């Protein structure tokens, strides 16, 4: 095996078993994650803590180039130079958390309904509710006053969390933000200023392209900060600073609670940045923190719309295509809504900035096209109403997600209006994510797809 490994090129995580050898297993890693699980008289090989969770609560992560020989008594780890090395055994807490679906049909449904609780846990880590101040759980190794530009890099749903954070950081901290999908960032040779901040977002902390982007940024001399759900992951271990989301294990392939917990962390970071840069007064900070504290309660209220959304899903399931529209921070949520629907129901869906409707998507509108409009009442609401009028004039079916004031102001005949609780527009994406997720979930249930493990998708994309 050692001789064969020396000839391999590219990324791999391998496990070898041998005929006639029931007490021998060999593993090797180069790129994708690989971990050793330690038990009593038993040893395991798996991708990460989630995979090994049902069997053991003690794991050692292999590093790139490592290979390991296991038997029931233990493991011997070698590095790329074939020298024996020690990799620390870490205790983790996912073993008991996987449990089951409780009374839910799918893990995704359970995870959607867990959001008020886990977002509340994440909130408590980043906000002092008594003083109404944001408190980072770790000391940041930089001063936001010295940061001239922020880059945010992620993939899939995490990139849409980053897109929302771009609005927050630019508005609250007056920091210019560049957003990239990791698969593009790592190859476009972006010039990064030494001492600026690069943020990387990943639920698993093992996303291959995001990890490669992190390594590129480190080589450029930027400060690196990761937002991850698995604090022992490769991205977490290689980042200068880690901000953990407290979503708990997320089993459904389509991310739900990890997304909203990422938003809570990023919102807290944006407020902290605004305060540090002198863009927010103490009164401003208190007002924003009060808004964050309300989010778990508002998410619980948003969940009460489920019976209405379940009914609507039966209509959506008859469609071949669905369009999602939003402005401001609702635009990234429109992208996320379209991604969720196509991921688990296999219905083609596209998300657009509402102002781009007349630049192409309007050609698709007819009586068969549902258009989901995400529009809390804010300073651009009237412009979004104008877009809805254009859709209605062409026979499109409008599904409006808004608050009570928005529902009263929008006099257009719509297929259905899903009324969300009243709240400020700044942090609305965390609450409006709930009906967006429920719509995708119930549509997929009607379609009869495998909601938790949709075809062709994996929970963690650990290869390019």
Regions found by a protein language model. Give the residues of each.
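Short acidic loop-to-helix transition motifs that present clustered carboxylates
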Residues: 7-10, 52, 179-188, 206-208, ...
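Active-site phosphate/pyrophosphate-binding segments
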Residues: 6, 11, 115-151, 241-370, ...
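Short, glycine-/Ser/Thr-/acidic-enriched flexible segments
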Residues: 19-22, 32-34, 40-43, 49-52, ...
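Conserved short alpha-helical segments that host acidic/polar catalytic motifs at enzyme active sites
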Residues: 1-101, 105-106, 114-148, 187, ...
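Acidic/histidine-rich
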Residues: 11-42, 312, 317-343, 378-380, ...
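Generic C-terminus detector
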Residues: 82, 108, 397, 410, ...
């Amino acid at each position: 095996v050692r001789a064969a490994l020396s000839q391999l090129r590219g990324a791999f995580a391998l496990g070898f078993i041998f005929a006639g050898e029931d007490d021998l297993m060999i593993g090797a890693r180069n790129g994708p994650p690989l971990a050793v699980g330690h038990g009593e008289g038993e040893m395991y090989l798996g991708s990460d803590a989630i995979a090994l969770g049902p069997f053991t609560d003690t794991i050692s992560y292999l590093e790139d180039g490592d290979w390991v020989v296991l038997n029931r008594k233990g493991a011997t780890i070698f590095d790329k130079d074939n020298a024996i090395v020690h990799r620390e055994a870490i205790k983790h807490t996912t073993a008991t958390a996987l449990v089951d679906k409780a009374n839910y049909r799918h893990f995704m449904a359970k995870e959607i309904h867990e959001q008020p609780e886990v977002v509340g846990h994440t909130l408590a880590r980043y906000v002092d509710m008594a003083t109404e101040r944001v408190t980072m759980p770790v000391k940041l190794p930089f001063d936001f006053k010295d940061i001239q530009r922020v880059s945010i890099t992620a993939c899939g749903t995490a990139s849409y969390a980053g897109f929302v954070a771009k609005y927050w950081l630019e508005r609250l901290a007056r920091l210019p933000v560049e957003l990239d999908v990791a698969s593009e960032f790592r190859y476009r040779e972006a010039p990064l200023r030494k001492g600026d901040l690069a943020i990387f977002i990943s639920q698993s902390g093992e996303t291959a392209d995001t990890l490669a982007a992190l390594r590129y940024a480190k080589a450029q001399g930027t400060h690196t900060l990761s937002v991850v759900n698995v604090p022992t992951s490769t991205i977490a271990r290689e980042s200068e600073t880690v901000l953990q989301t407290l979503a708990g294990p997320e089993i459904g392939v389509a991310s739900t609670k990890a997304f909203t917990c990422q938003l809570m962390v990023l919102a807290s970071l944006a407020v902290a940045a605004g305060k540090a840069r002198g863009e927010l007064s103490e009164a401003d900070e208190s007002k924003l923190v009060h808004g964050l504290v309300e989010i778990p309660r508002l998410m619980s209220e948003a969940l009460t719309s489920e019976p209405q959304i379940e009914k609507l899903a039966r209509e959506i399931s008859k469609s071949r295509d669905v369009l999602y529209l939003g402005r401001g921070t609702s635009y990234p949520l429109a992208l996320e809504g379209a991604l969720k629907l196509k991921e688990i129901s296999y219905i083609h869906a596209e998300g657009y900035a509402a102002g781009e409707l007349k630049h192409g998507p309007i050609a698709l509108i007819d009586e068969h096209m549902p258009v989901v409009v995400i529009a809390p009442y804010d300073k651009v609401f009237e412009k979004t109403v104008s877009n809805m009028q254009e859709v209605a004039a062409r026979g499109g079916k409008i599904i409006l997600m808004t608050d009570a004031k928005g529902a009263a102001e929008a006099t257009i005949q719509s297929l259905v209006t899903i009324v969300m609780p009243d709240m400020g527009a700044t942090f609305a994406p965390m609450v409006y994510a709930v009906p967006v997720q429920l719509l995708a979930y119930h549509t997929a249930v009607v379609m009869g797809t495998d909601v938790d493990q949709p075809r062709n998708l994996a929970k963690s994309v650990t290869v390019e």
